[in-house]
Amino acid sequence: MPWIQIKLNATNENAEQIGDMLMEETGALSVTFLDAQDTPVFEPLPGETRLWGDTDILALYDAEADTNFIIDQIKASNMLAENFAYKVEQLEDKDWEREWMENFHPMKFGERLWICPSWREVPEPDAVNVMLDPGLAFGTGTHPTTALCLEWLESMDLSGKTVIDFGCGSGILAIAAIKLGAEKVIGIDIDPQALLASKDNAERNGVADKLEVYLPQNQPEGLIADVVVANILAGPLRELAPIIKGLVKPNGALAMSGVLDTQAEDVASYYRDELHIDPIVEQSEWCRISGRKQG
């Protein structure tokens, strides 16, 4: 059946309250917050829900909803200016799951590595193929930071090497490393759900026997690896620099991403005391910092 969507604009101070009101008082089936100014929000504080200064609110209703009643309820809430602007749209019914699936295609990284959704045919059966379905929380290769790390791993000789994926998320980098020849990969993440996702995706790719996953507090003492990759954010890369450097063997390699071009030189400065840093690689304002630890 078709749906009705009502679009409002709010500030970050009252957007969540308005969203709650739409759900509780007007019968909205779902409420979505969008950035009205295309301004990214990075690195919220622990426990903080960050929204944009200018936020669009999209509320979805079934086709029979009384839009006059909904607008009257919004006015009565006094959460918006008296003459607030709004837009009512009718959305056609679609096979949303199929449309969502059609947006994802196999992606190639470097010369031989493919990330492919399970419902798509593998373009090159003889290439290195990682089967990974898009999820809500963790990387699938579409973000520049993940792509930068995948390209770096693909360029390395990982045969027989031990690799640490620091902040493993979906396990995409860990699984790619195994498929590219790594003997053993250790995934570390602060989120237990990430560890479950990594193990599940490794099972689907037939490489679970080569992947170990740990919360930071449970990782083995003295853990080090030939290759370390950390796709997290600039703040943690700075704060955890001593820990991350300590995971890299002498003459071992490290790659980091999740860093904007304006942050890259500063983040790199935290690692130059122990690593020879390669030229920084940029893609769509995001950067990869890589280097080799001094022997």
Swiss-Prot record:
Record keywords: Cytoplasm, Methyltransferase, S-adenosyl-L-methionine, Transferase
Keyword S-adenosyl-L-methionine belongs to the record: yes
Principal subcellular localization: cytoplasm
Record-listed E.C. numbers: 2.1.1.-
GO CC aspect terms: cytosol
Subcellular location(s) of the protein: Cytoplasm
GO molecular function, one term: protein-lysine N-methyltransferase activity
Catalytic activity: L-lysyl-[protein] + 3 S-adenosyl-L-methionine = N(6),N(6),N(6)-trimethyl-L-lysyl-[protein] + 3 S-adenosyl-L-homocysteine + 3 H(+)
Family, similarity comment: Belongs to the methyltransferase superfamily. PrmA family.
Functional description taken from the UniProt entry: Methylates ribosomal protein L11.
PANTHER family in the cross-refs: ELECTRON TRANSFER FLAVOPROTEIN BETA SUBUNIT LYSINE METHYLTRANSFERASE (PTHR43648:SF1)
NCBIfam families registered for this protein in UniProt: prmA
Protein's recorded name: Ribosomal protein L11 methyltransferase
Organism: Vibrio parahaemolyticus serotype O3:K6 (strain RIMD 2210633)
